[in-house]
């Protein structure tokens, strides 16, 4: 009320002066103050973090360590036609980012950025469960992980000692990786109609990640797997354009190199290689190989008259990989089989086509037609295999006789016609068909046809609405019965859900209501149902439903309040048959099902104050999510799988929730200086039936008896984290 009174009094006092000014001769307005050639700002302060529980999961993709904070730096400098911009965030931390741009108006733009994204898997710090992450392995050299020989000798002699031996040898280990991306781009306007473009992206990954290194199902190993690789992407293009359209052509290359091509790790159960059926003293596996892609492409968009525009893209690329192949086994006591060739000799030709047309036949209708082609033609020669070594333990015959080169061709045609049935209201009908051809799959080809209808309106000033219904039907052709064995599989019917026959119904609605200028509401909802009509086993059906509702209120120009709630629920039904070869394969009383159900609630609310009374910026946001799932097993009414007293045991449900709250306040004590503070709170909890003190804390499972699973203790553990920020902002 006091502010309103002051404004009214000021307006009344100004009236006589305003009247005099109207009567007097107009005087020229004073010149406006020119923008300074250099301006910017920076935040300097500190951040403080406290975590109870899993520190790694709290930090995850960010770095919230205690320390000095230099954040939000930005600077702009202008001179004549040149402009320079630069930014820096979270300087010196693992998630730091820097950007820079130099522009000469109408002639040149040069951009550069350096972006780091950490991924923190698990920490070695102690919590209420003990060490969060530990391993008995030590890194001898990149890609080589070793156990103490004494541990292997003791366990080989007495396998029941594995748990105690692993626990005594284990040391805490941090498992984390860091992705660093350098991005450089240049746009040079050579002439009024011709541009030259260059783009270089260099992405490096280093560190570790949880890695499964197994000797088979009975001897599974988890250890920190090495990461040290680089991807370089290069693009060079020339673009010509005029008032009717544009044409662009260029080269694209992508090159991947891995500094750790193989992983070798010790077997905790043996210190010496064993003959057939005994097992090796170590294992070896190839990691991601060096590879490259080289391609050319052309893109165009062109006007045909006043009402029609055509556009398209054509690309050809060559994928290749020729790294050295790993021998069949590292076990020195097993036979050595010569490789058909010493390098991979892998290559593929990839063709991409995208073409379309937008047209407006009259003022009330629109027509859009699109076509896409993706052709992956695998040129890799066959690799004959007669015998191979199974898990470095024994020699086995390879019945298939060699490798199969996977190829596929995907074509997509789509057309939409829209008609304005009323002012600012359109009814749209569309049809799309996707045709896929694949090699060495249960179906040689599939066709997925989609029919859709939608209604869009902005006819009322207070309402925006879209409602859409889709029906799609996928069918397979050319069933390859050679991939089935009737005696072993029971029936030659497809059960791979990505190619099996499927009918889908989907409806969705999105609406925004603005009853007042300061207040708006939004709503979205939908339902989808998939039915796999010819799948005797595997996925039978799945459905999903979702809706969200939200509101935004701005009582004043500097104040905004919002809240949103969302709900999602998904279900699946899968079917199988527990059967041994023989008559059981056709016994329907041995059928069983898994009914899966997942649902999630999310709630978000916040308040934003911008330059309230020219002094205060403040933002507060709360996010809460809760998710739960369950799996219910079902049997046939006359089931014969369980013979009393044996009975089916259901799994308990699983749930988890996360709450995040953030508050940031900045108070400006002058036009250039502000004092700020912030607080981040996050908590995560989980109720998982697979979690017990044994599974959470053990480095090998089970704790008693013969142990053949070695872990790093990487798991989804609960945590509560708090981070505070103090900073001084200086603007210049």
Model-predicted regions and their roles:
Residues 1-21:
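Gram-negative bacterial Sec-dependent N-terminal signal peptides
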Residues 23-34, 48-102, 106-732:
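Gram-negative and organellar
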Residues 37-47:
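Mature N-terminal segment immediately following signal peptide/propeptide cleavage
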């Amino acid at each position: 009320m006091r502010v309103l009174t002051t404004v009214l009094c000021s307006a009344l006092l100004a009236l006589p002066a305003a009247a005099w000014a109207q009567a007097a001769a107009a005087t020229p307005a004073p010149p406006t103050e020119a923008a300074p050639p250099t301006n910017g700002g920076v935040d300097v302060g500190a951040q403080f973090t406290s975590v109870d529980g899993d520190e790694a999961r709290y930090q995850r993709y960010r770095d919230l360590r205690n320390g000095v904070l230099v954040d939000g730096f930005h600077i702009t400098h202008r001179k004549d036609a040149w402009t320079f911009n630069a930014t820096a965030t979270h300087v010196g931390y693992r998630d730091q980012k820097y950007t820079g741009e130099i522009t000469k108006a109408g002639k040149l733009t040069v951009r550069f950025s350096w972006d780091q994204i950490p991924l923190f898997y698990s920490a070695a710090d102690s919590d209420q469960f003990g060490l969060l992450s530990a391993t008995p392995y030590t890194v001898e050299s990149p890609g080589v992980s070793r156990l103490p020989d004494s541990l292997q000798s003791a366990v080989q002699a007495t396998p029941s000692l594995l748990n105690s031996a692993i626990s005594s040898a284990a040391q805490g280990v941090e498992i984390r990786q860091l992705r660093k991306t350098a991005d450089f781009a240049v746009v040079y306007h050579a002439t009024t109609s011709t541009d030259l473009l260059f783009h270089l992206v260099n992405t490096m990954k280093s560190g570790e990640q949880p890695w499964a290194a197994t000797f088979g199902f009975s001897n599974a190993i988890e250890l920190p797997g090495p990461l040290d690789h680089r991807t370089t992407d290069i693009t060079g293009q020339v673009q010509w354009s005029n008032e009717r359209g544009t044409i662009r052509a260029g080269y694209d290359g992508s090159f991947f190199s891995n500094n750790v091509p193989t992983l070798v790790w010790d077997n905790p159960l043996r210190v010496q290689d064993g003959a057939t059926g005994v097992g090796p003293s170590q294992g070896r596996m190839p990691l991601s190989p060096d590879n490259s892609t080289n391609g050319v492409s052309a893109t165009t968009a062109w006007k045909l008259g006043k009402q029609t525009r055509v556009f398209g893209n054509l690309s050809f690329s060559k994928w290749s990989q020729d790294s050295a192949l790993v021998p069949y086994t590292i076990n020195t006591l097993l036979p050595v089989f010569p490789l058909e060739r010493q390098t991979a000799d892998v290559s593929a030709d990839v063709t991409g086509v995208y073409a379309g047309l937008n047209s407006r036949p009259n003022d009330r209708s629109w027509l859009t037609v699109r076509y896409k082609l993706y052709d992956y033609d695998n040129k890799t020669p066959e690799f004959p295999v007669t015998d191979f070594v199974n898990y470095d333990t024994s020699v086995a015959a390879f019945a298939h006789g060699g490798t199969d080169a996977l190829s596929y061709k995907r074509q997509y045609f789509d057309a939409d016609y829209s008609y304005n049935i009323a002012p600012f209201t359109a009814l749209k009908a569309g049809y799309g068909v996707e045709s896929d051809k694949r090699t060495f799959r249960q179906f040689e080809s599939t066709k997925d046809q989609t029919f859709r209808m939608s209604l869009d309106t902005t006819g009322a000033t207070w309402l925006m609405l879209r409602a859409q219904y889709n029906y799609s039907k996928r069918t397979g052709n050319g069933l390859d019965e050679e991939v089935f064995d009737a005696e072993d599989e029971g029936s030659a019917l497809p059960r791979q859900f990505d190619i099996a026959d499927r009918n889908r119904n989907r409806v969705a609605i999105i609406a925004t209501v603005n009853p007042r200028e300061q207040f708006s509401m939004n709503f979205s909802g939908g339902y989808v149902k998939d039915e796999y009509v010819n799948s005797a086993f595997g996925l039978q059906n799945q459905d999903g439903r979702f809706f969200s509702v939200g509101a935004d209120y701005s009582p004043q120009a500097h104040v905004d309040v919002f809240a949103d709630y969302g709900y999602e629920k998904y279900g699946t039904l899968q079917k199988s048959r527990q059967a041994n070869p023989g008559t059981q394969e056709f016994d329907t009383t041995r059928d069983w099902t898994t009914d899966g159900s997942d649902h999630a609630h999310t709630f978000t609310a916040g308040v934003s104050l911008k330059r309230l009374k020219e002094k205060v910026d403040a933002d507060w946001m709360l996010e809460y999510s809760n998710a739960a799932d369950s799996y219910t097993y079902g049997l046939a009414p006359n089931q014969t799988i369980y013979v009393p007293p044996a009975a089916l045991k259901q799994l308990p449900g699983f749930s988890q929730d996360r709450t995040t709250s953030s508050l940031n306040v900045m108070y400006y004590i002058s036009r250039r200086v502000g004092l700020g503070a912030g607080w981040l709170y996050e908590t995560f909890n989980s109720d998982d039936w697979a979690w017990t003190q044994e599974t959470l804390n053990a480095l090998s499972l089970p704790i008693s008896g013969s142990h053949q699973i070695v872990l790093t203790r990487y798991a989804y553990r609960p945590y509560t984290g708090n981070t505070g920020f103090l900073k001084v902002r200086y603007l210049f």
